[in-house]
A protein has these predicted regions:
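Short glycine-cluster motifs
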Residues: 74-103
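Short, glycine/charged-enriched secondary-structure capping and boundary segments
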Residues: 21-24, 46-49, 68-70, 92-97
Length: 103
């Protein structure tokens, strides 16, 4: 797989608790996969991040996961974010990481 998946931790409370590295990653990737785009758009707008975003959540994790893995196979770099915190802890991120390992 030539593309990469970035697991990006987002602030639990104050939006300004995000790291510079995560902000740079969110601006540089080809696509952001967000657990809840309605919440994540607030973060992206606050920091003027214009990267395209798609939903990736509990109810579409298998189908959307396959789409995201295929995009990475084609060279796309994707950032995975959750509503708050680190992907893979109490959210569908674990499933996408597993799919990437199997690809």
């Amino acid at each position: 797989m030539s593309g990469k998946l970035y697991l990006c931790a987002t602030p639990i409370g104050n939006l300004e608790d995000i790291t510079f590295r995560v902000l740079r990653t969110l601006k540089e990737v080809d696509l952001i996969a967000a657990e809840d785009t309605r919440n994540s758009i607030k973060l992206l707008n606050h920091f003027e991040i214009k990267t395209p975003m798609t939903s990736y959540h509990e109810y579409n994790k298998i189908d959307k996961g396959m789409v995201l893995v295929e995009k990475m196979r084609q060279g796309a770099n994707i950032a995975l974010i959750t509503d708050a915190g680190t992907p893979g802890i109490s959210d569908p991120g674990e499933e996408l990481v597993s799919m990437c390992h199997q690809a």
